[in-house]
Amino acid sequence: MCGIVGYVGRDLALPIVLGALERLEYRGYDSAGVALIEDGKLIVEKKKGKIRELVKALWGKDYKAKTGIGHTRWATHGKPTDENAHPHTDEKGEFAVVHNGIIENYLELKEELKKEGVKFRSETDTEVIAHLIAKNYRGDLLEAVLKTVKKLKGAFAFAVITVHEPNRLIGVKQGSPLIVGLGEGENFLASDIPAILPYTKKIIVLDDGEIADLTPDTVNIYNFEGEPVSKEVMITPWDLVSAEKGGFKHFMLKEIYEQPKAINDTLKGFLSTEDAIPFKLKDFRRVLIIACGTSYHAGFVGKYWIERFAGVPTEVIYASEFRYADVPVSDKDIVIGISQSGETADTKFALQSAKEKGAFTVGLVNVVGSAIDRESDFSLHTHAGPEIGVAATKTFTAQLTALYALSVRESEERENLIRLLEKVPSLVEQTLNTAEEVEKVAEKYMKKKNMLYLGRYLNYPIALEGALKLKEISYIHAEGYPAGEMKHGPIALIDENMPVVVIAPKDRVYEKILSNVEEVLARKGRVISVGFKGDETLKSKSESVMEIPKAEEPITPFLTVIPLQLFAYFIASKLGLDVDQPRNLAKTVTVE
């Protein structure tokens, strides 16, 4: 199992190729690589391991290439090593090939080439293809490919690019899947449709014995004799949601249930690359966190962790406000921009502004190769996988994971604090097991028009996030507020028609928030509480309870947010709304 992708067009090839490779991860792989044509030269980067290893190798390299190929490899010929990973090139580095399948006569071909003086660098059958194409090239890549395929035996598919024709991409199919994606001023090759779904639904499925010759503006199909072939363009009925929903009714629900894995993968990713982090928070006078929406709420929780564990003053600012406010920033500050997509316009421009003022900038993104990923001085990655639902769920807890791990990195208690974080996936699993009870609570309040969410300290941002989730997908007005500020305004709204969601794990502010609950009850408010399982005191003061397992204070935000996500989901679903694509919202906001 492995994947081929190729791009030729008007946009930057690297992020497109990397993104397409991520969408082929499900096919299984042990290494990954890309090849780009940059200023007349072939740039090849390939790494054993996950795509994140490839991204690390590409870090800080701002390539402008508009043509590229990529590959995820599952070893067949040769062990999983950097050298055996694709793409493979000829001796001069002028042709690059990515290949799936098996060349059955590669040993015979390899010996012939060796006798002609060709030197091989890998143990793979794929390298034979690159050397043969280079040998057969006489100024026309298609002619060289036609000569080459006549010598190959086996089941295979491959894609090739050359520095001699930088705006050309050729793909060959013989027994291994390969499709062409048709765009406007750009065209694609891929092993499977999901890889290119974000860019086009127009597909040509190649048959065995066919060659696709692509430029940004043309697509021509030939047989192995070089004769033109007429092909039908298919409009795929798939979209990214239906292709990857995995049996769940909605993508959002699937992603809620993927959170234990997203948290675990993000923690593993952080720990495996921690030594490469080139800064210490304590070396700066201040941390500024800039973000929008759900990412802002993650940053807000991160503020509390950073101040508590790293001891560095931290501010959280909406990216849209930061850009136009007179925030003093200097080289004594570190600015962390959080964006799931890595393309959020306000966050991207705010980071650029901070960088211009001398700050050290860090991107926290879920999409490798995105603008924020490329443009920041350093990037941290969440490993949540593609998130299709517009309302962020698993990327939120993945962001929390990265922020927690970063904040405790310099703490004397680091080992104990990391052990706490390692417990979180299991605790989230336990919380997800309460979904049926949460659904019953949701059914009880689904017809309400307004709700108030209250929290304190670490769980005040969770109140904000819970309210945002409800309004995003159910269109019910909801407001998150610090519980201690209730008496300074929101208390005027509380009556028997106002459900009040109170987040109350047993932490340092537990007694205080119980007092807030009493204030709500005194005004006939209807209390929906989120608290520890077995908390009879809280239960006695609540009309409804959504329980979480007992946990240490620092990690409670990971747990308290889960029932709030489910609560919002069940209400929206029962109201018959489009949970995954709520009105007026976009997954990636690339405008101001």
Swiss-Prot record:
Assigned keywords, A-Z: Aminotransferase, Cytoplasm, Glutamine amidotransferase, Repeat, Transferase
SUPFAM superfamilies: N-terminal nucleophile aminohydrolases (Ntn hydrolases), SIS domain
Enzyme class: transferase
InterPro entries noted in UniProt: GATase_2_dom (IPR017932), GFAT (IPR005855), GFAT_N (IPR047084), GlmS/AgaS_SIS (IPR035466), GlmS/FrlB_SIS (IPR035490), Ntn_hydrolases_N (IPR029055), SIS_dom (IPR001347), SIS_dom_sf (IPR046348)
Residues covered by the Glutamine amidotransferase type-2 domain: 2-217
Domain SIS stretches: 277-416, 441-582
Keyword Ligase on entry: no
Annotated Gene3D superfamilies: Glucose-6-phosphate isomerase like protein, domain 1, Glutamine Phosphoribosylpyrophosphate, subunit 1, domain 1
Name of one Pfam family that matches: GATase_6
Localization, UniProt: Cytoplasm
Domain of life of the organism encoding this protein: Bacteria
One Gene Ontology molecular-function label: glutamine-fructose-6-phosphate transaminase (isomerizing) activity
Active-site residues, as the UniProt record annotates them: 2, 587
EC numbers for this chain: 2.6.1.16
CDD domains documented for this protein: GFAT, SIS_GlmS_GlmD_1, SIS_GlmS_GlmD_2
GO biological process: carbohydrate metabolic process; fructose 6-phosphate metabolic process; protein N-linked glycosylation; UDP-N-acetylglucosamine metabolic process
GO annotations of cellular component type: cytosol
Catalysis: reaction(s): D-fructose 6-phosphate + L-glutamine = D-glucosamine 6-phosphate + L-glutamate
Summary of the function given for this chain in its UniProt record: Catalyzes the first step in hexosamine metabolism, converting fructose-6P into glucosamine-6P using glutamine as a nitrogen source.
Subunit and interaction comment: Homodimer.
HAMAP family the UniProt entry points to: GlmS
Name the UniProt record assigns to this protein: Glutamine--fructose-6-phosphate aminotransferase [isomerizing]
Organism annotation: Aquifex aeolicus (strain VF5)
